[in-house]
Amino acid sequence: MAKYSKEALDEALLQAQSSDISMKTKGIKFLRQASCLETGTKNTYPIRDWFSETKNYTKLFKIVKSEKDPKLLWEYLFLIKTYCERYIDLAYLVKDSQNFIAKKENTEFKIKACELGELFLVNQDASVRQAAASLLWYLKKTSEVWSVIIELMQKKRDYITLSHIGIMIRNCYSLLNDDKVITDSFENTVTKENLISLKDAEALKEAVSFSLEKTPKAAKKAGFNSVSETLDGIITTLTKTAER
């Protein structure tokens, strides 16, 4: 049996529902690995076919909603974001994908992913809030995530958290300085004014400086010196826009 066959993915989803933490972790790890694989290989087709089956993603999202362990929730939110990015939104790079791209289940998957992001954006655990914010930013390019990011950076500044925040900030800068029409993952137009406010950009700049001061090792490893410069660019762009 191929490693990422339908049967193997079914088994992983079953393991993810186990009351045994080691078995549950094993199942989630397998699903995450599947979502992170390089696309365009022989594994791509069975993986995306499995994830795009209504019964499978419905069960997956139900499991995520009932999960209480912050570490496992982070894994779930990360794998969902990665699947959306690699398998759905970049499907046009994979040959013989016309039928897959046309599947309404892909949009339904992303709608349910947004619902999860909104649900866990107010979770008590900072790492879960970060994962939810990253997911929502990827799918919707919504400014609502920044207040959450600013708040959690006061308390959680490990390398993984900061590196994901850095990715969001750099992406925001790229979008602000792109002449193309900005769209979210649903092809809805997003105005530059709705990406981030000047107030939030300035607060992020302070939070980044605070991270470099309080946890320099993790912050520097996450590239926060360049992230700080990126925020300077965002603030400059927003200031010029406000002066027009």
Where are the model-predicted features located?
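Amphipathic alpha-helical scaffolding segments comprising HEAT/armadillo-like alpha-solenoid repeats
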Residues: 3-13, 40-62, 89-95, 107-118, ...
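Short inter-helical turns and helix N-cap capping residues of alpha-solenoid HEAT/ARM repeat scaffolds
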Residues: 19-20, 68-69, 124-125, 157-158, ...
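Residue-level detector of extended alpha-helical repeat arrays and alpha-solenoid scaffolds
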Residues: 24, 73, 129, 161-162, ...
